Design a protein with these regions (language model features):
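Conserved catalytic core of nucleotide polymerization and phosphodiester-bond processing enzymes
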Residues: 1-158
Length: 158
């Protein structure tokens, strides 16, 4: 298996790791099975915001194609929702910066990060607003934790 190869252990040991993980985090296996079954029935999965990923190979007889679609079915709702949330935060941030004539601009998005260029005089207000806008980009059962870094370059900000 991929886990065995990645960890440099036998397939049997890797399967034991997986079994222990599922035993400790009981909801994970149920979630995965539920998502897989739903994807097989509907042919797609959705993010929390309703964006769909269609999975035409989810019922394929070819095991490799089917398993790839199953992995996508399991990963896409979470990864897609994270992508949706960062886009919502980015739009909110852009709108706030524009409507308030803040001397700052969004430079890029990297996974779940936004990188901004901000005038030194506006760092404090932008810092505070980023925290608020990003943490309130979606209402979830868990909090969205935001870490804001400041520096003269991306490396320093980390």
């Amino acid at each position: 298996s991929g886990l065995a190869k990645q960890l440099g252990i036998s397939r049997h040991e890797a399967q034991e790791y997986v079994n222990r993980y599922f035993k400790r985090y009981t909801g994970v296996e149920a979630y995965m099975n539920n998502i897989r079954d739903r994807a097989r029935k509907l042919g797609f999965v959705e993010t929390i915001f309703g964006r769909r990923l269609y999975l035409p190979e989810i019922n394929n007889r070819n095991a490799h194609r089917r398993q790839y679609a199953e992995r996508s079915a399991i990963n896409a709702p979470m990864q897609g929702t994270a992508a949706d949330i960062i886009k919502i935060a980015m739009i909110s941030m852009h709108n706030w910066l524009s409507s308030n004539n803040i001397p700052a601009k969004i430079i890029m998005q990297v996974h779940d990060e936004l990188v901004l260029e901000v005038a030194a005089t506006s760092i404090d207000i932008v810092h505070e607003k980023i925290d608020h806008l990003m943490s309130s980009a979606a209402t979830l059962d868990v909090p969205l934790i935001v870490d804001v870094g400041v520096g003269k370059n991306w490396d320093e900000a980390h």
